[in-house]
Amino acid sequence: GRGGIGTVFRDKKIKAIVAKIDGVKGNLNNVVDLKPIMEKGKKFNAEMREFDDDQAEMRTKGTAHLTNVMNDYDLFPTNNFRFGSHPDAEKVHSEVYKKFFTQGIPDGCWIGCNMSCAKGVDNYLLRTGPYAGDRVIVDGPEYETAASLGSCAGIFNPDFTIEANFYCDTYGICTITWGTILGFVMECYEEGILNDERTGGLKLNFGNADTAMELLHMLAKGEGFGVTAGLGVRAMKLMFGEKGWGDPKFLFDIAMENKGLEYSQYVSKESLAQQGGYALTNK
């Protein structure tokens, strides 16, 4: 869903597309030789049941199990990719998210998968925005969202991440893109490229969860600095440079995007494959 399809939907006044068919089953794609696949599937499912609770814990934590793994290996994007780890990351440890996730129900993305790593937060009380006071179901957060709407903006608060996750889904905004945008504008603010006058009074320091949430709602309503942030990292770095709001080379260095698409949430220094994915993406 990344790359602008949400903008196309909005232009066409489409909220969502739902495809439904009768008779959903594991062999929906009509494979040529089903028997060996079923045998491998049984083996894979048995291994998940036996080992997952002691290894990745995907069945109870989903992809959010990666938060502490990435932090331990200095690969957890922090403060707009300045750092790969942070002492406060313990506040968003996978054990913390595990307590938020509803457990014990089949919540997978496909029939027959007994890992069911797609997690959700049920009965979550919203504190801000148009649905403040409502209790809702939040899909996720997945790892990418836990990092983008968290450490990338210097925010280590699961409640912020879960609520921002809900509103990004509701507003039709990519959580990865928005988190990387947040990291960029926060670094610009801390480096003096942006100031209170240019942000309309928003104090966009790393870690300022209240202002980050306010900016998300402004973006959705097309108000104030939310309009500027909504342009994306590439457009902002060019615009700020043209306005003389900072050294264009420095803006280029801190703009985590390629071909106009904001980076996903991995510090790529340890992975040539990840670097290639960022640099050679066809968007």
Go through each PLM region and give its residues.
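Extended C-terminal regions of large enzymes
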Residues: G1-K283
